[in-house]
């Protein structure tokens, strides 16, 4: 007789090979036919709301790994909340305006953008942005991200622009917006102001100079000193700013020394605390401090500029420190915020001797027309020749660069629009207290950034952006922004989009009969030519998209990368507080690290170390990318490399093989009729469910804490340690050899069903494709929605199946004995004493505290140890002896037993197998 036919051999049709790159697109088509997103909302309608507001990626390129990590985490969160009974609307968005798209389209099309009409240029930018929205959307859909992809928000859409105009109007009306001439970050290459969030710092080589400013005054306070020999020594790392010098700042409370170097007929004034350091840099080993005075003593004295025919006033400022330099601070109000405020306090006129392109103006004399970087060596040489250079050094310092063109920027005073953050800073800081921060230090980071920030420069000298909705009266010249003008422009943009601003005259946009609210004249009006900072666009999304189109505010959660503390998190907070007069627009704020290569380096094209999500989809499948995101501690930088994905493939296969084992052995099992009650289950099976309960609790806690890597690692450990290495090995004999519908087999199948059902639900937020594939292949209870695992809640622990703690302690001891037995069996195999473990008989000695093992049924214990025979005695310590089993090998189950052949008519079978075969009435 061919006994193989009598075995319950695993069969389910669930493939061992995943074939994800081919199988996943089929699943995407299934989800599309199912209308997964909308069906999910219908299923959970009326349940508690969880709203994750999408931070809009920039629509200027294909997906990169940073996009993939961010969207994967968002999908994990939304799916996990949906499967815990929440209503989870999710509207994806895109940030469309700004310099990155202008730069990209100019580079791509080699356009002379200045020769193009504004309308044509903006149309080209719009088409470019739309193209990459489609590219990115397809990539996110390929990842399996569940969202309303047919109705995303775009910051360039007319409706959004109209609502953003109203946000600007609210902030203006609240008195927080003004126009002023003050220093801002300026990119000479792109000829526009920049926000702090658009600045990147790089280490650059630099020549730092110590410069002598000769005393100009008649020395009424110092009559005993020779004016012609006396100079103040300043220090700067930006030589090109020296033509803009108007003052030298001293700390009023610090002591300043008049210093005479040995062998030189000159006198230098510098901070006494820095004298030794500065004189050393100047090459003077020997010097004399002639006298000292407090900084306040020199206030309003005049020094001569070292190479221009003008003077420099001595002023006082508390920000002058003794950390570096000379204590005499070069002050150019056109190039620094502190400089500007100090000179403003002393009533000095603003001087900006550099134009939009970073070239010196006529004010700089012989350097007029030179770019700032070109003038540095020329000015340096001129100072050397004139004898005004005290010393110079070559250093490397951290210098700001434009985030888009990567070129050095300058600090330059220009007329700009600002949001006065100072006027509502305290409210913004207080709003941070009501937010759950993940990680917790996020609160202090954002609070400190808001506390330290200056006013927000919100104007840009660009054409691809939302126009600043302000008019100017031609008669009085004052800016105009009222409820009436805001309503008119918002209504116009709603109908025609913001291109109307560039295509229509001011009078045609304003209400008929409109007059200037300042002077009452109707002589004519002009439009503002600047556009709004892109951070104002994205900072308005919580109002312009979430509240006005979705109907709820604030969002439950914001989640973005670490850089968004100074970007989107901050701009959203400032708009919410400054414009709307509310608190933070999010209840929870979560951040993740950067994506880096396997060595921890940033990924750059020049290094060739980047990874393309599309290539990962094609090589490994989207579920492997999701597993990468779900297995990484995203609070720090997340590494990705081909080696990492190969390792993840092994972890993935462990889970897939676990699911396959369950599915293969659940063929013919109906949970509606075949589930075994806890009291009727074998204790081993209840042990497995009790271990599952521990996993469920850990997974729930991990999802609550957004620790997705803990979810993945816990499930992987459960599959490897509890199931594959222990439980599955033991129950194979029961599953394959016991009667198909026997109580013992149904007991094991009950445990397998509960395990598979719970694990599939728990892992579904992360392994979306694979868990859906499992769900569609597995048996279900009538209460389940078999269409998608996402339509079902995660299970709670099966408390009714749980073993008491003392029983679990016994099983821990059994597992320890099994480990010892396995070691002894390995040695016996190596010694050729036995072949397979079922050929063995083991003698086990256990210490007194484990005496319960001696009382266990010998056959049951042999099954647990996967040997044919076992004897247990109580002694001093745990020992194991292995010998060949006594008896004959059963032709069906392969156990070696003395009872084989004792059933009449079944000479080669053990009694258990004989009974099963007899019941099947199988004839060869």
How does the language model describe each region?
Residues 313, 346-358, 462-464, 487-637:
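Alpha-helical recognition segments enriched in aromatics with Gly/Pro capping
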């Amino acid at each position: 007789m061919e006994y193989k036919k009598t075995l319950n051999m695993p069969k389910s049709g669930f493939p061992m090979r995943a074939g994800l790159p081919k199988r996943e697109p089929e699943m995407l088509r299934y989800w599309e036919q199912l209308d997964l997103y909308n069906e999910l909302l219908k299923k959970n309608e009326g349940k508690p709301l969880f709203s994750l507001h999408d931070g809009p990626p920039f629509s200027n390129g294909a997906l990169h790994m940073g996009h993939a990590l961010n969207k994967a985490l968002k999908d994990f969160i939304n799916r996990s909340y949906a499967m815990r009974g929440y209503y989870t609307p999710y509207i994806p968005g895109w940030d469309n305006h700004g310099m990155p798209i202008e730069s990209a389209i100019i580079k791509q099309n080699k356009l002379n953008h200045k020769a193009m009409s504004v309308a044509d240029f903006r149309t080209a930018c719009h088409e470019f942005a739309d193209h990459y929205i489609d590219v990115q959307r397809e990539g996110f859909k390929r990842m399996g991200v569940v969202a309303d992809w047919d109705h995303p928000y775009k910051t360039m859409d007319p409706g959004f622009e109209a609502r953003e105009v109203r946000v600007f109007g609210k902030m203006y009306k609240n008195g927080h917006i003004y126009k002023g001439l003050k220093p801002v970050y300026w990119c000479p290459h792109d000829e526009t102001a920049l926000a702090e969030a658009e600045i990147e710092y790089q280490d650059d080589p630099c020549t730092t100079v110590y410069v002598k400013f000769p005393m100009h005054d008649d020395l009424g306070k110092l009559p005993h000193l020779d004016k012609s020999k006396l100079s103040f020594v300043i220090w700067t790392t930006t030589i090109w700013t020296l033509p803009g010098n108007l003052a030298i700042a001293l700390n009023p409370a610090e002591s300043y020394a008049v210093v005479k170097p040995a062998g030189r007929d000159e006198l230098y004034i510098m901070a006494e605390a820095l004298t030794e350091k500065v004189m050393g840099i100047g090459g003077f080993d020997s010097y004399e401090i002639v006298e000292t005075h407090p900084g306040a003593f020199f206030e309003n004295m005049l020094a001569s500029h070292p190479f221009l025919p003008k003077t420099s006033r001595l002023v006082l400022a508390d920000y002058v420190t003794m950390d570096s330099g000379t204590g005499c601070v070069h002050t150019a109000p056109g190039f620094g915020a502190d400089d500007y405020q100090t000179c403003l306090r002393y009533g000095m006129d603003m001087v900006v001797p550099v134009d939009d392109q970073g070239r010196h103006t006529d004010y700089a004399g012989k350097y007029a027309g030179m770019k700032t970087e070109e003038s540095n060596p020329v000015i340096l040489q001129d100072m050397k020749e004139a004898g005004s250079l005290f010393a110079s050094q070559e250093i490397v310092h951290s210098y700001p660069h434009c985030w888009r063109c990567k070129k050095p920027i300058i600090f330059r005073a220009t007329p700009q629009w600002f949001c006065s953050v100072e006027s509502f800073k305290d409210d913004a800081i207080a709003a941070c207290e009501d937010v759950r921060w993940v990680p917790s230090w996020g609160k202090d980071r954002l609070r400190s950034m808001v506390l330290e920030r200056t006013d927000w420069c919100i104007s840009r000298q660009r054409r691809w952006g939302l126009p600043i909705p302000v008019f100017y009266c031609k008669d009085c010249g004052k800016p105009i922004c009222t409820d009436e003008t805001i309503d008119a422009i918002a209504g116009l943009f709603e109908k025609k989009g913001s291109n109307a601003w560039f295509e229509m005259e001011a009078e045609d946009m304003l209400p008929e009969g409109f007059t200037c609210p300042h002077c009452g004249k109707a002589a004519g009006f002009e439009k503002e030519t600047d556009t709004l900072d892109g951070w104002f666009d994205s900072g308005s999304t919580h109002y312009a998209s979430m509240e006005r189109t979705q109907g709820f505010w604030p969002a439950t959660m914001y989640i973005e990368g670490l850089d968004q503390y100074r970007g989107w998190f901050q701009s959203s907070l400032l708009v919410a507080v400054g414009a709307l007069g509310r608190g933070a627009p999010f209840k929870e704020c979560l951040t993740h690290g950067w994506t880096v290569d396997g060595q921890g380096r940033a990924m750059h094209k020049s290094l060739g170390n980047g990874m393309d999500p599309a290539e990962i989809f094609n090589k490994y499948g989207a579920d492997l990318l999701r597993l990468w995101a779900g297995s990484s501690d995203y609070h720090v930088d997340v590494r990705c490399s081909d080696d990492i994905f190969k390792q993840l493939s092994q972890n993935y296969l462990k889970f897939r093989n676990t699911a396959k084992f369950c599915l293969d052995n659940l063929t013919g099992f109906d949970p509606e009729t075949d589930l075994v009650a806890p009291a009727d289950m074998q204790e081993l099976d209840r042990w497995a469910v009790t271990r599952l309960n521990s996993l469920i609790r850990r997974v729930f806690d991990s999802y609550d804490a957004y620790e997705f890597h803990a979810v993945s690692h816990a499930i992987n450990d459960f599959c490897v340690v509890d199931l594959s290495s222990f439980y599955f090995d033991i129950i194979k004999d029961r599953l394959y050899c016991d009667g198909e519908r026997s109580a013992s087999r149904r007991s094991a199948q009950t445990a397998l069903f509960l395990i598979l059902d719970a694990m599939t639900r728990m892992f579904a937020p992360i392994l979306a494709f694979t868990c859906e594939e499992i769900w569609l292949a597995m048996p279900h209870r009538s209460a389940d929605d078999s269409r998608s695992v996402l339509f079902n809640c995660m299970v709670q622990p099966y408390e009714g199946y749980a073993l008491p703690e003392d029983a679990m302690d016994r099983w821990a001891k059994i597992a320890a004995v099994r480990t010892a037995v396995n070691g002894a069996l390995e040695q016996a195999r190596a010694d050729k004493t036995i072949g397979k473990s079922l050929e063995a008989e083991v003698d086990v000695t256990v210490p007194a505290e484990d005496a319960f093992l001696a009382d266990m049924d010998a056959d049951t214990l042999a099954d647990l140890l996967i040997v044919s025979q076992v004897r247990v005695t109580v002694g001093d310590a745990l020992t194991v002896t292995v010998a060949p089993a006594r008896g004959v090998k059963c032709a069906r189950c392969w156990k070696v037993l003395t009872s084989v052949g004792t059933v009449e008519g079944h000479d080669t079978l053990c009694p258990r197998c004989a009974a099963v075969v007899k019941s099947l009435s199988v004839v060869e």
